[in-house]
């Protein structure tokens, strides 16, 4: 699996920090790590399948996180569970001193994407969540890499600290952002990540910056047939906002992405909806563009508020910059 590349580089960093004979020491420690992964093949496949079947959405990955934590504890890692005020986030540590190497694990599923392990569309459970982005394998691969590097540290008496970060809610870009703000990554020397794909390669690209926000409009309920003039429709405000954003699209750069879903649109058609919420993702290659577009979206929302005489509130869930690629580290990955 591609996580073998990840563990090779982790081993390289540890070996380089602990030996003057870097190349020979690294190759030996690398072979130990690879052998450990191969020996654990059945165990790791079972973990992957279990997390696939759990299929828990962001911030609700209780069984998935518990399984990973139990495997880490069984193998001598010290684990802090529920870090950064997120019950399904954790930090597992092994070793001591420098360098401090981090490995990122994800394990959240996507709502409505339940799927059996086959190429045709066939849900395990209709309407349930599923691992459409392969995070069952991502978390398992990170676990396998951490255990393999730990085996190498033990056998070759390598110095350094290895950390596996359990980062929940990747699909909504929450876990890592909140952990970063909480200082969980402050003392790292290097942090490694991987993602399941259709091919094995070193990805040297970037990812889009993003702001995730919920726009809630509060109106006035009324009977839609008997006295609609007494009501103020929050759903009208949401719809007008969405229309405005859809016309906005023509005037954005090609890399911009504007996604939304109405999470609350009222309770019954014969009642003027007193509350409605729409959830937006605003993305672009550069964070400065995301900030510009988000202000534009917010201006449109405020216009909808005025047109419908409702009251707008905005909740920003997360705000994330684009990925800054580490070219020397990518070259080290490719070489190993």
Regions found by a protein language model. Give the residues of each.
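Conserved short loop/turn motifs at secondary-structure junctions
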Residues: 56-57, 165-169, 317-322
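Acidic/His- and Gly-rich active-site-bordering loop/insert found
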Residues: 18-131, 140-160
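Acidic/histidine-rich catalytic neighborhood of metal-dependent amide-processing enzymes
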Residues: 137-207
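Divalent metal-coordination and catalytic microenvironments
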Residues: 51, 92, 103, 135, ...
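Midchain, well-structured core segments that form catalytic/ion-binding scaffolds
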Residues: 186-336
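Short, conserved micro-motifs enriched in small and acidic residues
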Residues: 131-140, 228-236
């Amino acid at each position: 699996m591609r996580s073998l590349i990840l563990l090779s580089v982790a081993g390289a960093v540890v070996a380089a920090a602990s030996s003057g004979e870097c190349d020979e020491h690294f190759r030996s420690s690398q072979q130990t790590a690879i052998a450990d992964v191969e020996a654990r093949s059945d165990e790791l496949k079972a973990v992957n399948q279990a997390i696939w079947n759990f299929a828990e959405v962001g911030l609700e990955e209780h069984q998935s996180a518990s399984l990973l934590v139990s495997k880490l504890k069984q193998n001598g890692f010290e684990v802090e569970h529920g870090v950064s005020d997120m019950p399904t986030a954790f930090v597992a540590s092994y070793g001591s001193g420098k360098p401090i190497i981090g490995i990122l694990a994800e394990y959240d599923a996507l709502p409505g994407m339940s799927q059996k392990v086959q190429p045709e569309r066939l849900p395990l459970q209709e309407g349930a969540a599923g691992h459409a982005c392969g995070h069952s394998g991502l978390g398992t691969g990170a676990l396998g890499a951490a255990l393999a590097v730990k085996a190498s540290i033990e056998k070759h008496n390598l110095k350094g600290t290895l950390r596996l970060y359990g980062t929940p809610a990747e699909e909504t870009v929450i876990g890592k952002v909140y952990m970063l703000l909480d200082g969980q990554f402050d003392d790292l020397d290097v942090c490694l990540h991987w993602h399941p794909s259709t091919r094995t390669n070193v990805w040297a690209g970037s990812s889009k910056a993003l702001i995730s926000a919920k726009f809630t409009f509060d109106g006035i309920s009324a009977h839609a047939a008997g006295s609609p003039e007494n009501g103020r429709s929050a759903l009208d405000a949401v719809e007008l906002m969405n229309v405005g954003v859809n016309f906005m699209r023509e005037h954005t750069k090609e890399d911009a992405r504007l996604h939304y879903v109405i999470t609350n649109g009222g309770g019954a058609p014969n009642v003027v909806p007193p509350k409605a919420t729409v959830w937006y993702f605003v993305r672009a290659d550069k964070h400065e563009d995301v900030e510009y577009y988000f202000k534009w979206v917010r201006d449109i929302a405020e216009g909808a508020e005025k047109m419908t005489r409702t009251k707008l509130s905005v909740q920003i869930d997360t705000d994330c910059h684009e990925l800054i690629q580490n070219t020397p580290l990518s070259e080290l990955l490719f070489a190993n």
